[in-house]
């Protein structure tokens, strides 16, 4: 490892025990390395969607389809919050690189596996590593960037998450059609290698955020809380993934999963109240209205975002007859506006020190955009779906990263790792839960419409055929009717997004309108 001196050309600041230049090539390299890492971990959220038909054909594993996506999601959500404690008691650099190694190992297993079971296990392993990388990337920024500049850097990095989530199905389809579905996972290896090399050589940290003995660290990792939290989240996500899709909501398995979730969650809450400062989530963190308001805001806004990420491509493919690749291209207005406004939002928050007004504006714009998108119909022109997506992307880009900004500017440095992991977890959980809810809304509405207007068709067969097969299987008046039904079903998922965006607006009203005291009291970081 090398540590060149910047004294001759730059002034630098010490943040968290790390000597970091205000703006230099090493900071640029660290940011690029983090972007590579966030990009590949975010791809894994949705890239497998367009590869599933080819995978099931090769492995003859139609019954395993649900696990290809949920295995990664389950482990990612389950370990995100515990990673906050690891980042608190151990050097950020080594925890981050360890998580990256586990993620890369899982991706490698997915790429070389000869069986469906191997793919599921590989996805689960990748999720174990991925759960620590998003919050870890944001923590590295807090270590390297003066407070007033953090929102701009963090905003850019977090915009990569949204971009990757949107374009992942497009990349997955391209790899599957032109190379091999295995490249959906191999692509992570070079990205991860670049990120690991950059972080290893350019990011230097000396001490953990909290100094403690080995015994104190073991207690601070909250093994009892973790032992109840992990299975609780797994039960919740399995119930929302399976309910209404693989099993009826009244099925004994779904009821049992929700019951277990409730019992385990109650145990976790009790353990957190008992452990206090040694808890995975110290109760005092949730007493401030900025913290719980930001958590609710992120939960709802992310749920709305992922509803559109999943169902706008379905609208393009089923209603407007585009291919999977073309639908990805038509999502570019959402992607581009998201990136631009994430950067603009970060710069404005950095300049003013305020985040409350931007959270309100973001939620208001998202509510309007969701309402406009719910007005789409089979004859909607390009001007409508482009303009509505630009408004949606602008609103999401403006607000997506703000919950993290809140905790990083209002809490003590010792609480930032845990609070950052909390916000990351809440946002991931919101996306996971409401995509499942939207799936049930979509399937139930489409099935009801088919039974009412086309009783000669099997709703399950139509749904399982997928949007891209619609025009190959049906024609004439039947096709016209099915297209209208698909439009109606997708629009109903957008109604869900309207409610979520409105809820995020209510949550934003809780946030205090005052500049961060720390941002004002650090004139050297302006």
UniProtKB/Swiss-Prot annotation:
Pfam families: MFS_1 (PF07690). It is a multi-pass membrane protein. SUPFAM superfamilies: MFS general substrate transporter. One of its GO terms (cellular component) is plasma membrane. The chain crosses the membrane at residues 23-43, 64-84, 89-109, 125-145, 155-175, 183-203, 218-238, 254-274, 296-316, 339-359, 360-380, 386-406, 418-438, 491-511. Efflux pump; part of the gene cluster that mediates the biosynthesis of aurasperone B, a dimeric gamma-naphthopyrone. Belongs to the major facilitator superfamily. TCR/Tet family. This is Efflux pump aunC.
């Amino acid at each position: 490892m090398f540590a060149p001196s910047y004294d001759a050309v730059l002034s630098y600041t010490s943040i968290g025990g790390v000597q970091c230049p205000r703006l230099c090539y090493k900071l640029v390299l660290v940011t690029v390395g983090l972007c590579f890492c966030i990009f590949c971990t975010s791809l894994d959220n949705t890239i497998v969607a367009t590869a599933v038909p080819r995978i099931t054909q090769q492995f003859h594993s139609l019954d395993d389809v649900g696990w290809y996506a949920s295995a990664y999601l389950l482990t990612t959500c389950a370990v995100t919050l515990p990673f906050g404690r690891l980042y608190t008691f151990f050097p950020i650099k080594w925890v981050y690189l360890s998580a990256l190694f586990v993620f890369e190992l899982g991706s490698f297993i997915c790429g070389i596996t000869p069986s469906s079971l191997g793919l599921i296990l590989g996805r689960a392993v990748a999720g174990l590593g991925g759960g620590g990388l998003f919050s870890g990337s944001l923590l590295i920024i807090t270590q390297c960037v003066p407070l007033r500049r953090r929102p701009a850097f963090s905003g850019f990095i977090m915009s990569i998450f949204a971009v990757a989530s949107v374009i992942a199905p497009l990349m997955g389809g391209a790899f599957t059609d032109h190379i091999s579905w295995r490249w959906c996972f191999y692509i992570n290896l070079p990205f991860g290698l670049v990120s690991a090399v950059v972080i290893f050589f350019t990011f230097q940290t000396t001490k953990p955020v909290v100094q403690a003995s080995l015994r104190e660290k073991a207690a601070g990792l909250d093994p009892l809380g973790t032992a109840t939290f992990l299975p609780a989240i797994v039960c919740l996500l399995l119930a929302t993934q399976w309910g209404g899709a693989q099993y009826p909501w009244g099925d004994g398995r779904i009821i049992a999963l929700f019951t277990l979730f409730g019992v385990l969650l109650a145990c976790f809450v009790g353990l957190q109240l008992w452990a206090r400062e040694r808890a995975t989530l110290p109760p005092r963190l949730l007493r401030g209205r900025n913290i719980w308001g930001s958590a609710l805001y992120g939960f709802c806004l992310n749920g709305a975002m992922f509803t559109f990420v999943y169902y706008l491509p379905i609208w393009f493919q089923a209603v407007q007859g585009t291919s999977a690749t073309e639908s990805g291209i038509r999502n570019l207005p959402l992607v581009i506006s998201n990136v631009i406004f994430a950067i603009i939002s970060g710069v404005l928050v950095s300049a003013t020190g305020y985040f409350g007004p931007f959270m309100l504006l973001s939620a208001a714009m998202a509510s309007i955009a969701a309402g406009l998108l719910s007005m789409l119909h089979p004859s909607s022109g390009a001007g409508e779906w482009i303009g509505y997506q630009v408004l949606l992307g602008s609103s999401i880009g403006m607000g997506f990263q703000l919950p993290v900004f809140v905790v990083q500017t209002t809490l003590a440095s010792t609480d930032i790792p845990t609070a950052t992991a909390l916000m990351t977890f809440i946002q991931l959980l919101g996306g996971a839960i409401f995509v499942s809810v939207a799936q049930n809304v979509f399937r139930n509405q489409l099935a009801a419409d088919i039974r009412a207007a086309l009783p000669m068709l099997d709703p399950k067969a139509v749904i399982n055929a997928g949007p891209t097969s619609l025009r190959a299987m049906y024609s004439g008046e039947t096709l016209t009717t099915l297209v209208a039904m698909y439009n109606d079903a997708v629009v109903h998922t957008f109604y869900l997004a309207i409610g979520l965006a409105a809820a995020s607006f209510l949550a934003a009203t809780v946030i205090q309108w005052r500049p961060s005291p720390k941002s004002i009291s650090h004139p050297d970081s302006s």
